Amino acid sequence: MQQPAIMKKTSRGADWSTPESELFAERTVAINGPINADTAVAAVAQLRYLDRNSGDPVTLLVNSPGGSVSDGMAIIDFMRGMRSPIRTHALGIAASMAAVILACGEPGFRSAAPHADILVPQPMSGISGQASDIEIAARSIIRKKEMLAGLLAEVTGRSLEVIEAATDRDTWLTPDEAKSFGIIDRVCADWNYEGSVR
């Protein structure tokens, strides 16, 4: 779908921009779609640019069915090294790695829209091949599951046992349940917290 153009009158005439560039000008970055290498590179590049130019808060909008653990961790590792606080907000869906990214936002500023779907992840892989390949892949999945459980325990304040039980199978949460679980801090339609908040 083609982005609509937005016209702004200036002293020089008219300037044209897209909704995406308007969000970026407001220090807002969107992860929209599966988390993969392209998503990670785009998100990190935008976050880096905003962090270099100011230490003011950045909002990260998340609408993603999840995806690669490695690419999601690249985004999280970069977020954690920024001087700008990262406010996260789920719109639509934040599943699997997207839910982990959502949870890794600035404490007190992690939110979800009232009808967002949030999935606490269980790492998966389509394992095939010889027995030794399957064994190596299984060990890798177990390591990733332990790493994600430790990270979620850290950012939610839940015990490792509670996180491991929740990630033993995919766990779908409403925004209110995600708030109780510690993945988010607020349920609100507006990521600037200007509307109704609970």
Describe each PLM feature range.
Residues 1-97, 103-198:
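N-terminal organellar transit peptides
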